[in-house]
Amino acid sequence: MLSRLPHWALLAVLCFPCLLHAESPVEPVRMGCGIMTFDTVPGWGLRPNGQSAIGPTHGSVVIDQAGNIYTSARAGVFVFSPAGKVIHSYLGGDYTNLHDMEIREEDGQEFIYGARNQDAEGIKFNAHSGEVVLRLPYPEESGLGAIQFNPTAITVAPNVDIFLSNGYASNHIFRYDQAGKYLSHFGKKGNGLKEFNTAHGMTLDTRYDPVRLLICDRNHQPKGRLLHYSLDGEFIEEVITGLGMPTAVAIQGDYVSVPDLHGRLVILDKSNTIMAVLGHNPDPAKRANFNVPQGEWIEGIFSGTHGSYWDADGNLYVQDWNVDGRIMKLVRVQ
């Protein structure tokens, strides 16, 4: 058939075959198994020109009561509609370098708590106005001396006490009251049973009564594990091991999503048994790799899975640690 084309068209086909496929749509990829089966949403979160809307990502994902999705990037916090369009952003200044976020309703308003690793503080701001209402600096009254302070994770207890993990430094977890007054700390760096080797992620484990802290011990050797601690800082148990480099935890009902920096997302049930593994990257060179440009992204394959969050329908939003900034939507298959 090529021989019947005009000479100029034949030359174009031979020299630029990619033109034939430039407009080929990307198909959804199905992943997971059983009740934890998901389809990707190609192009979700991208600009109309197909480029990333957010720039380099090393952060988190949360969702407000209206269903809007907040993700943190180097530049600031971007707010997406469920359809994947940027509807608002908080850029520069106080909103940069939010390594972890938690969103809470308090007295009829929604607030985002954030851990700013490169800026050595925790922060609380109004999710809808951006007003900063609280800062959590290193608590010198802890008596630990002049230590490095690089917070990686934050969570809030039912009584509004705040827990802030110094996961990129001393690995202490600091507890403050709702006004920001230092109360206590626990933990230390190490590979022992009750120590942390990068207490990278943390949330309240609401599957238990009373609630517990669920902590990602990302670089623990050789395990890569999750731990339970009481809200008083008492060790409870090693929850699960063998998770690679668990970066964060998000809970909906009985289920936990655990991003693994090696390029996959693990889902656990209430017994902390693995139910499904999503987005597994088969290429060792592209696992835990920040420098995978958008041109090398593969639909349904993760590279540096760093944050995740469930919406009310059980869909997942996943952020990769990535030079160009990647956030993905996974739709639960009913």
Per-segment meaning from a language model:
Residues P42-A75, G325:
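Beta-strand-rich domains and repeat architectures in extracellular enzymes and scaffolds
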Residues S303-Q334:
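Blade-level signature of beta-propeller repeat domains, shared across WD40, Kelch, NHL, RCC1
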Residues P42-Q51, L91-D94, V133-G145, K181-K194, ...:
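Surface-exposed loop and turn segments in beta-propeller and other repeat-based domains
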Residues G50-A66, D94-G108, E141-D161, N191-R212, ...:
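Beta-rich, blade/repeat-based domains predominating
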Residues R74, N117, G167-A169, R207, ...:
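Short loop/turn segments immediately following the C-termini of beta-strands
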Residues E23-G43:
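Blade/loop signatures of beta-propeller domains
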Residues P48, R74-F111, R116-N117, E140-S142:
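Blade-loop segments of beta-propeller domains
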Residues N68-Y70, F111-Y113, D161-S165, R212-L214, ...:
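Conserved beta-propeller blade signature
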